[in-house]
Amino acid sequence: MNVNIRRMTLEDIVQVVAIDRVSFSLPWPERSYRFEVTDNPASRAWVAEADGNIIGMIVAWLLADEAHIATIATLPGFRRRGIARALLTHALQTMISEGAKNAVLEVRAGNLAAQEMYRRFGFEESGRRPHYYKDNGEDAILMSLSDLQVNRETSN
């Protein structure tokens, strides 16, 4: 399977929202993705595409020298195939080249697969937001990566 990672466009929004809806119990509304693509100067958004279909996406914000991973997801049938890893690698490498020195994100306490991937990149748990997710009161785990540089995962 040949996967191409490219900037998210307005034409991708319908497929991106579909990925979001099957991936998260609290998906972003379509207008949020439109804002990220057209109006948010801090936003960096990409999609992973295979055979003309969007199979994954990531939205990150570059805030001063900090890369904030806002959301990342792949279609269920494409999980555990390195798509999210490729998206995160691409996002971090791009933001490093734009001056990012560290990275942060939030992840559900129960999303162990995502936490495992983030740890492979060097992210460490830096805090917890109790009852953060409104649908079920689940905690958010805050993870951070200090001294961001091309490392063992981002160099793949």
Language-model segments: residues:
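Preference for well-ordered, secondary-structure-rich cores of eukaryotic proteins
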Residues: 74, 85-86, 102, 108, ...
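Conserved G/P- and acidic residue-centered "switch" motifs that form tight phosphate/ATP-binding loops
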Residues: 82
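Short glycine/proline-centered loop/turn elements that form peptide/ligand docking sites
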Residues: 88, 110-114, 131-136
